[in-house]
Amino acid sequence: DPYFSGDPSVSNVEETTDSIYVQTEWDFEVSDYYVQVNAGLRYEETEVPSTAEVRVPIQVNWVAAGEWITVFQEGVEEQDFTGKYDVLLPMFDVKVDVTDDIVARFSWGKSITRAPIGFLQGGRSFSGSPKIGSRVVSEGSTDLKPYESTNLDLSFEWYYDEASYASVGLFRKSVKNYIDTQGRLETFDGLNDIYQGPRWQEAVSALQAEGIQATDSNIYDYFREAGYADADGVVEPNSDDPLIEWNVVKPRNLDDSKTVEGIELAVQHTFGETGFGFGANATLVDGDVEYDPYNLEQQNPLVGISDSANFQVFYEKEGLSVKVTYAWRSDY
């Protein structure tokens, strides 16, 4: 097979993390209020090596009116990639017993979520059938940083009866290093494009002069009649053709940060010793979710952000547990 060597692009990736942390706890009273403080600091250093066996493209041939084929070198080329990052993650929690029944909590800290492992794989993969409008290159990146969130929470809890309580909480999360996977147009030396090259333009002009519509099929037939194709109907690019513009899909960290904030409400009530009770909770959330269809610049609004609520009635007594739950979520 002149177009596929039989060796697919293969990549391996690892994550090696070294970390150290310190943590401390204090219990004390301030003006008859019992206070608990938990504080900590964690440092992590992560290395991301990746080895890829990559098929290297030579050229893109036009083999039929609607079919284009990427020609690759025989065998594969081994490529090594290495990424590295470090993070400092502080944490500070405070719990205050305001009364015997009311508890206040405050929390501030940073947390991370690592990039999906598939995004970290090194190497570059060209589509094997790059039709016009579908010329895609997929790349990973070992340089991706993890999502980093700064979290702020404040809540009050009222335990007004045994197994019964009500609570309200405020939260705010500011997340940076969001990953963008939108494609960008790039060219690569040596990969020339028959489409819109001099011979293509020649075919379009000749067909239009004869009153024939310049469809891909008619242009391909012109190429064959003009001797631009070999005996098998394969048209190869030449140095006069422009470089192909590939849609390169490569994950990248965004420079801006996104914010999510909201309020959480919850209540649970039990009816004495009967075993019957109910619970309800709601989360009202807002964030950077706006998208302007008239703005031509690239936009990256948060997705999946919505209000939600749950309601449950239950019976729990003498080893028997029965629950009926209703869940609701708004549009997003």
Stretches with model-predicted labels:
Residues 1, 169, 176-181:
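Outer-membrane beta-barrel proteins and related beta-barrel translocases across Gram-negative bacteria
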Residues 1-101, 115, 119, 125, ...:
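Signature of Gram-negative outer-membrane beta-barrel scaffolds
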Residues 18-28, 35-43, 90-98, 102-110, ...:
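Membrane-embedded beta-strands that build the outer-membrane beta-barrel scaffold
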Residues 13, 83, 112-175, 195-208, ...:
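Outer-membrane beta-barrel signature, preferentially recognizing the C-terminal barrel domain
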Residues 49-56, 117-123, 130-132, 179-185, ...:
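Outer-membrane beta-barrel translocator domains and adjoining extracellular loop/strand segments
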Residues 53-56, 68-74, 125-127, 135-139, ...:
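Short C-terminal domain-edge/linker segments immediately following a structured domain
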Residues 172-174, 190-332:
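Gram-negative outer-membrane beta-barrel transporters
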Residues 44-50, 103, 112-116, 175-177, ...:
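Flexible loop/turn segments at secondary-structure boundaries
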